[in-house]
Amino acid sequence: MTKDKEPIVKNFHLVCIVTLIVGTIIQFSDADEFAIDMSKTGLTHVPKDLPPKTKVLDMSQNYLSELQISDISFLSGLKILVLSHNRLQLLDLSVFKFNQDLEYLDLSHNQLKKMSCHPFVNLKHLDLSFNDFDSLPICKEFGNLTQLDFLGLSATKLQQLDLLPIAHLHLNCILLDLKGYYVKQNETESLQILNTKKLHLVFHTGSFFSVQVNMSVNTLGCLEMTNIKLNDKNCYFLMKFLLELTKGPSLLNFTLNHMETTWKCLVRVFQFLWTKPVEYLNIYNLTIVDDINKEYFIYCKTALKALKIEHITKTVFIFSWSSLYTLFSEMNIMMLSITDTPFIHMLCPKTRSTFKFLDFTQNVFTDSIFENCSTLVELETLILQKNGLKDLFKIGLMTKGMPSLEILDLSWNSLVFNRQRKCIWVGSILMLNMSSNLLTDLVFRCLPPRVTVLDLHNNRIMSIPKDVTSLETLQELNIAFNSLTDLPGCGTFSSLSVLIIDYNLISHPSTDFIQSCQNITSIKAGKNPFQCTCDLREFIKTISQMSSEVVKDWPDSYKCDYPESYKGTLLQDFHISQLSCSTSLLTVTIGATMLVLVVTVTFLCIYLDLPWYIRMVYQWTQTRRRARNIPLEELQRTLQFHAFISYSGHDSAWVKTELLPNLEKEDIQICLHERNFVPGKSIIENIINFIEKSYKSIFVLSPNFVQSEWCHYELYFAHHNLFHEAFDNLILILLEPIPQYSIPNNYHKLKSLIAQRTYLEWPKEKSKHGLFWANLRAAINIKLMEEKK
């Protein structure tokens, strides 16, 4: 029973005191004020270490059995105290005498039997309901609670003057728990509930309604009753009970929670209320027992505007469906809401209907609903979400007989459209919700012509065909959670101002949408897998320049999904150079760079002789590499000279004035035939001997060298030594150019060497001499072993 009552009371409290609680909590936002939640913590006594500045204290759903002054006296600033669902049996309200700021006190769902009173001043909410009081716990001190807004009470007996101490108060809500109420048969009690706007009566669960109390309430505008169990016999008691409560013209809203009744009794209750001033009748959790047969009902003039029934359960399954549906379809009211029921159909009214609003959410209706129905001429809103609708074409035909229909909700069905035929819709529809269906691109060939708000989110749409019927009046389009790959243009939606297209497959949206949709005031396109490439730059530039009021969720919902290096990057933080994105610009840049390079190389070659410098550096590098690859011991074992010089006598002046001074100044030993050849030995023997004792053989080539026979011999033996010793010991210096035709045919060795080997060319420019000598010295530089004594 507790489980049943908790949501009921919470709902009622929400209606009655939400403003009070919110307003109070807002005042507790300062850092030095506290809200303590100790609910469901197994407390058996009030903790002693509560912060003295506590403003809100929740100790509900614990095991507290008593409350003493010392428990809360130090909480002088306490404003809200919740002690519901505990084990309190006795309570002296004087425990709160030091809590003068207390405004909200909830003592419901305890075991209170007795209560001692104490005056309060600021109390606005007092809940003593769902306790074990025999009579209503009303103290005379309650008469001073001029700010009291909500009062919750419990009693097993009622007396007419129980509420006299608070007769002068103007309450907003009274919750009266009558779960333990009992009166002997044929006895009637009276209770005058003077001034309250809302009255909530909670009866015992499982017991047939038998309360016989004459209640009268002044200014009652809202009546709510919970746990009503009726059968054909005691149905009269409910109507008798309501007779006094429904007399006043101010009762406009009547709600029944957890109602179990027979069909016959339900019809009688409807007939009873049909002539009362009640305008809004709500029934939540209705259970129909026994058979459903045709019952006579008079649809006389009524003040009732709206009937809402939410969640119907039937205990019988074989009955007259027409009797059930006819009762509701013929009602002469403006608004009918029957939701969460096993209804599979609803009949078309036989005569012109007064319905302006119909809500049949979460039933089992099929495509045959209101088929060929022409009596719903005043219907403006029709809600058919969460049913079994499948064929959109048939639904369009259904609306043909509803000339006033403006709002149609078909969401959460299984609608498809795969016909080539043109759909027929009533022309009055302005708002159409077809979200969460199975619709594809073809749906754009089956839309009402004057629709202004269209919701197609969560379908199977991949694109918007360009040849669809023009929807010139469409202002809002929600097409989120589909599979679109690009933003739609406004060619067919010239009045579009709001577009919701997030959660699609848009990777590189075009800017045509922005250009063609000049009336856009709101666009939501985040949560798409954007590919951050060159194609996206223009879109980012355009959308980032738009107002944040227009581009919703920018920039947080707009992130790169590809490539991996940019995944998760906000679009506003994605940057790529113009050069990377423009082929023509890249071509021009590369061409210009190559042109500058060619001009530079040409200048260096012509004016600075760059090739000569390159050859010299290359030769020096190769020489150093070869020298590192030859074992030092092998080079040093017989060497006495760094170089053997071979030259023509006509070139001796250059050798003595240029070559020797630049080589021998760094302890380099040069072998010259005129100073080192051994007298008495043959010239050939001296040549061979000193070539073998030299690390390198330097030949100064010129036209004079070609004409010298001894120079040729020296070259021959040096070349022979090259192959014999298996390392490179020849260095050719071209002092002057030697034309090939000037070399005698019998000097084939010289011809082949000049043709095949790299030589050092003596530069005419003096600025190049330094590099020449450095290169030559590096080629012959080696540490010679000292002669053994």
From Swiss-Prot:
Give residue ranges of the LRR repeats.
54-77, 78-101, 102-122, 123-147, 148-168, 169-196, 197-219, 220-250, 251-277, 278-303, 304-330, 331-354, 355-378, 379-404, 405-428, 429-449, 450-473, 474-495, 496-519
Ranges that cross the membrane: 588-608
| GO MF, one annotated term | lipopeptide binding
Q: How does it assemble?
A: Homodimer (via cytoplasmic TIR domain). Heterodimer with TLR2 via their respective extracellular domains. Binds MYD88 via their respective TIR domains. Interacts with CD36, following CD36 stimulation by oxLDL or amyloid-beta 42, and forms a heterodimer with TLR4. The trimeric complex is internalized and triggers inflammatory response. LYN kinase activity facilitates TLR4:TLR6 heterodimerization and signal initiation. The heterodimer TLR2:TLR6 interacts with CD14 and CD36 in response to triacylated lipopeptides.
The record's principal subcellular location, in a coarse class, is: membrane
Instruction: Give the signal peptide, or none.
Output: 1-31
Q: Which domain of life is it from?
A: Eukaryota
GO CC terms for this protein? Golgi apparatus; membrane raft; phagocytic vesicle membrane; Toll-like receptor 2-Toll-like receptor 6 protein complex
Q: What is this protein called?
A: Toll-like receptor 6
Q: Which stretches face the Extracellular side?
A: 32-587
Q: List the cysteine pairs that form cystine.
A: C117-C139, C235-C265, C348-C373, C423-C446
Which species is listed as the source? Dasypus novemcinctus
